[in-house]
Regions:
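Non-catalytic surface loops within mature trypsin-like serine protease
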Residues: 10-12, 59, 95-98
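An amphipathic, aromatic/His-enriched active-site/gating alpha helix that lines ligand/cofactor pockets
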Residues: 24-36, 56-92
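Short, well-ordered beta-strand segments in beta-rich or mixed alpha/beta enzyme
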Residues: 2-9, 40-69
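Short, surface-exposed ligand-recognition loops at beta-strand->loop->(often short) alpha-helix junctions
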Residues: 9-22
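Glycine-rich beta-strand-turn "strand-cap" elements at beta-sheet edges
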Residues: 2, 40-49, 77-105
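Short acidic/polar alpha-helix capping motifs at helix-coil junctions
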Residues: 2-5, 15, 27
Length: 105
């Protein structure tokens, strides 16, 4: 598994419209992306925290292929509607060190 996150700083007064645009882009451009297991937009619980977009891929190569794809470019071209809500962002990538899944029996 390979994980890419994007920390998106959005002023509270722009949050609702930001979420609408971001969710629309997720639903439009992410289904069918090869190797993409899951995409989650996390809402902050405090006004000083950013939104966090979390994308889980099978491999780093799948992530890189997505970033180079026409779908990625089109989604980010459409992000002009989102960008006006974001005051800053930070992309980070990770490979799991441990993945513990707990379920009830």
């Amino acid at each position: 598994m390979f994980v890419a996150t994007n920390r998106l700083f959005v002023p509270a007064e722009r949050a609702e419209e930001f979420e609408e645009h971001f969710r629309s882009n997720m639903r439009t451009f992410l289904p069918g992306v090869p190797g993409l297991r899951r995409s989650t937009l996390l809402r902050p619980t405090r006004p000083d925290q950013p939104y966090v977009s979390v994308n889980e891929f099978d491999t780093e190569e799948d992530f890189k292929a997505w970033v180079a794809s026409a779908s990625f470019k089109e989604a980010h071209r459409r992000n002009a509607g989102i960008a006006r809500h974001v005051t800053g962002n930070a992309v980070e990538t990770f490979q799991p060190s441990e993945d513990l899944v707990l379920t009830e029996s």
